[in-house]
């Protein structure tokens, strides 16, 4: 069935025209297919001045049709601002803090293609952007610098200021990319549950994120934290990976801490006693690695707002550390570059307040002819610096391969 859907996506005449056009568009992988958003009537660039107004606006909106929603992303820095955490980092390429779009056309690709559109006539301007690689990838910090940050955080862990913290490294090159081409290649080689692509006039994002941060339908909310990574080998399988995670003290500690933190985050917005683990400590398999996952759910308190839920759940604890606020403060003291999209969240908010957001990891950001790929691995009390540094490369590998 997956191949059949891929075939329809690739060769449907309408979609081919859309892919080859200059229209901004978004593709989001869903459980049984893909949703494509385009013909945007509004584009909201988030900032400190408008983030509260944007989130509060959903309390007054009415849902009448499928296109009554916003789709887009929150960057890492704007989420810190929402929590009242100061950031003094600088970025070579100052990127958007977050962008949300109001679509007038949504194309749902399942066994068949369904189009929901407020546009009477579809117009396409032919456009094709080839991929150009102008320089090789360079890592923003070498191992010696990483080790220095690692040692600082290890000391903070021994002092009890944090229990786990995730150090970010970036691969960066000079390039322009065709995001449509990159996205479908990635879906063929490394499709993940929360994959997405954004093609805008002056930037693009391609992601094979595996992690669902929150899924809200009505008063029910679900989160699926990932904590635990194992590199694949020729002999490994899900059973051997599960055995490894269960027998590995470091991985078990890390997973338990993150699950407890996500349960705590949910408890702040849910009815007391309703937060529960639906599926505990199972393995998901990807091209280069295995992940250790738990599914948690709860029933939202009556009258809970979109802003309250976002502030409670973001940034996702599994890619930050524990406890969240103090760990964010420590990270921002040591990381000298903006994370931009990395460890932010992409998804949609419907006018009926249903929403779905991932954690933005395993992603390429292309902006001003520069591509950057970020990765982060967890530091706990008994972590080894070299192993965590190398794990970042494993996580970035499937994206780096797209540029070959």
Locate each region found by the language model.
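Extended alpha-helical targeting/anchoring segments
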Residues: 1-404
